[in-house]
Amino acid sequence: MVPVISGSSAPCDVCQQVHRDLTRVLGSSAPDDWLAVSEGERLEAELTPDVCILPYRGGTRHFIRGHIQLPVVGPEPEVFVWAVWVEVDEESMAAIARTWSDPNRAATAPLTGRLATGLPYEQPTRGLQVIIHTRDPGMAPLL
């Protein structure tokens, strides 16, 4: 059974406790691979809240941050968000960069990538293929 998380005053279906002010977004500030490289290697890389560029074996790896939204069952519809990193190829990164500030970027065709963040589930999540749907400027892409 999966616990039902709710920030309302209704008791949890699993533990019967009332959970208030629960975090609705969890995630990492960098891709797992960024966290695995040395400080020296990080000097050659770039990390912003939305993009990571990481030199790797004579090439470059490209990552963007996106959101996986999961519905939360409760008295009021809510959403829990995993803020994760996705590795994209150079062509996809160029397409993302071209439209990043475009007010109509949500109309951009979906792209593909691979999950670059491990999530705490029984089965491994790193490397899973995802479809990236860009949204309006200021909003992380939906995966």
Labelled PLM ranges:
Residues 98-143:
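C-terminal, charged low-complexity interaction regions
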Residues 12, 35, 83-86, 101:
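Short linear interaction motif-like sites in intrinsically disordered regions of transcription factors
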Residues 5, 56-62, 69-71, 86-88, ...:
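Long, leucine/valine-rich, helix-dominated scaffolding and oligomerization segments
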Residues 31, 85-90:
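Helix N-cap / beta->alpha transition motif
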Residues 1-77:
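Basic, glycine-/proline-tolerant helical and adjacent loop/strand elements
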Residues 31, 79-82, 97:
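Intrinsically disordered regions, especially transient/low-confidence alpha-helical propensity segments
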Residues 73, 81-84:
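Short, intrinsically disordered terminal segments enriched in charged and Pro/Gly residues
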